[in-house]
């Protein structure tokens, strides 16, 4: 699993029907990193550091069998020290 | 899921039979980025910013059980601010 | 799916039995790029630009249930303009 | 499989229910490398060099059918010479 | 599939029970490249150039249903010319 910081909620105009039941969040490995989109079954808020599961396990981790996710939040980290190589400008 | 910009429709001379029922689009993570090919079950047009699902979930997300996709568009983003590190020259 | 150029046929001395029934081609994302090996159920020739499917979908895309592939050619592209960032020296 | 060095135990405030039964460790490919999170069914301690399995195989490797992992420790390496390109400052 | 050179046998002190029945080899994409660990159901020796299958197909390719592998050797290449960009110093 990788560690991401929650950036914000993602608003999409038109999703496939299978995706309609879960919030999608924009997450980044570090501030300024490439944005990715994760399914959030945990209930996170911007600024949280979270553990995300990818690969085929991301599907069941949503709690909905067969949900089409390749990145799902599976936990919130209590205290996370940003690694030295990460950007800490925000 | 990752975020891509739709570039154009991809025309292929000869596809395997399993792939014949869905449009294929060329998508890029940013203008000038490496082109990838995504299955489009949503109905996108060039210039749209879209959410794409990879891994094994890309298959069912096409809406056709067992479709051989490793990248499928699952949503169109309403408004997307291009991240600062992306190329915006086009 | 990603786009590759077919380089040549790959000859292997000793394959696992499950792999014996399909041709393997060396493909590259661009001239001079890292060589990868794709299963070819379509019938390609060197110089063709092809669409390759990875992940778990690469298996069924071979046309043989349970074939052990992680990269399978699923279509030949009619006309492909090499992106500007690609090496065109060959 | 890739080779990682165990850094420390990861404490998360709120995990999905499916993840509650196994310890999670922070692992890195080399000292100072990007931290990743692996499920540990073997029983490792900080400083151990371990083999981690990703992809869909990471799930069953936890020993719990359907566990939502994309990175699971599957073995401890007896003696591992750090490759020359790795950082050895710690 | 990717192409690797076999480096050496990997000795691990403690493996999960599911992994005990197959040899593990350290492989590299080129001399000096990052070491990875592949399951070897073919019978390779150090110096061999091999084809490795990843993703979910790596599991069945071991010949043991449900084996927890994400990288499995599926063939030995007869003659492999090292690409120009590879390090040939060893």
From Swiss-Prot, chains A, B, C, D, E:
Cell compartment(s), UniProt: Carboxysome
Keywords linked to the UniProt accession: Bacterial microcompartment, Carbon dioxide fixation, Carboxysome
GO CC annotation terms, alphabetical: carboxysome
GO BP annotation list: carbon fixation
Span of domain BMV: 1-78
PROSITE patterns in UniProt: BMV
Induction remark: Induced by growth in low levels of dissolved inorganic carbon (at protein level).
InterPro entries per record: CsoS4A (IPR014076), EutN_CcmL (IPR004992), EutN_CcmL_sf (IPR036677)
Major localization listed first in the record, in broad terms: other
Transmembrane segments: none
Key word Transmembrane helix present: no
Taxonomic superkingdom: Bacteria
Keyword Lipoprotein: no
Intrachain S-S bonds: none
Function: Probably forms vertices in the carboxysome, a polyhedral inclusion where RuBisCO (ribulose bisphosphate carboxylase, cbbL-cbbS) is sequestered. Has been modeled to induce curvature upon insertion into an otherwise flat hexagonal layer of major carboxysome subunits.
Similarity comment: Belongs to the CcmL/EutN family. CsoS4 subfamily.
Note on domains (UniProt): The tight homopentamer forms a pore with an opening of about 3.5 Angstroms in diameter which is positively charged.
Subunit structure: Homopentamer.
NCBIfam families per the UniProt record, alphabetical: carboxysome_A
Protein name in UniProt: Carboxysome shell vertex protein CsoS4A
Organism field: Hydrogenovibrio crunogenus (strain DSM 25203 / XCL-2) (Thiomicrospira crunogena)
Gene: csoS4A
């Amino acid at each position: 699993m990788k560690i991401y910081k929650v950036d914000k909620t993602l608003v999409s105009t038109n999703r496939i029907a299978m995706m309609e039941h879960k919030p999608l969040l924009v997450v980044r490995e570090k501030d300024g990193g490439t944005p990715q989109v994760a399914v959030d079954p945990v209930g996170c808020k911007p600024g949280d550091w979270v553990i995300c599961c990818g690969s085929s396990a991301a599907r069941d981790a949503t709690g909905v069998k067969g949900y089409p996710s390749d990145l799902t939040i599976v936990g919130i980290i209590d205290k996370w020290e940003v690694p030295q190589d990460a950007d800490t400008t925000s």
